[in-house]
Amino acid sequence: MAKSKNHTAHNQTRKAHRNGIKKPKTYKYPSLKGVDPKFRRNHKHALHGTAKALAAAKK
């Protein structure tokens, strides 16, 4: 006779939780890889303007 059971989830959650299910690490500056090129170009200039405004406010 052919085998009948091809899959079971038994013990899988226990194995996963033994080391803890971790969230992916988040970084302060996430990569802009894959972001719309038009947005990236404008973002560069927006950051520069923000830096100038912060510097002026600091004085």
From Swiss-Prot:
Q: Which InterPro entries does this one have?
A: Ribosomal_eL29
Chain intervals with Basic residues compositional bias? 1-26
Instruction: Print the keywords alphabetically.
Output: Cytoplasm, Isopeptide bond, Ribonucleoprotein, Ribosomal protein, Ubl conjugation
Q: Which GO terms describe its cellular component?
A: cytoplasm; cytosol; cytosolic large ribosomal subunit
Q: Is the keyword Ubl conjugation in the record?
A: yes
Q: Report the sequence similarity comment from the record.
A: Belongs to the eukaryotic ribosomal protein eL29 family.
Q: What does this protein do?
A: Component of the ribosome, a large ribonucleoprotein complex responsible for the synthesis of proteins in the cell. The small ribosomal subunit (SSU) binds messenger RNAs (mRNAs) and translates the encoded message by selecting cognate aminoacyl-transfer RNA (tRNA) molecules. The large subunit (LSU) contains the ribosomal catalytic site termed the peptidyl transferase center (PTC), which catalyzes the formation of peptide bonds, thereby polymerizing the amino acids delivered by tRNAs into a polypeptide chain.
Q: What is this protein called?
A: Large ribosomal subunit protein eL29
Origin organism of this chain? Saccharomyces cerevisiae (strain ATCC 204508 / S288c)
| Name of the coding gene | RPL29
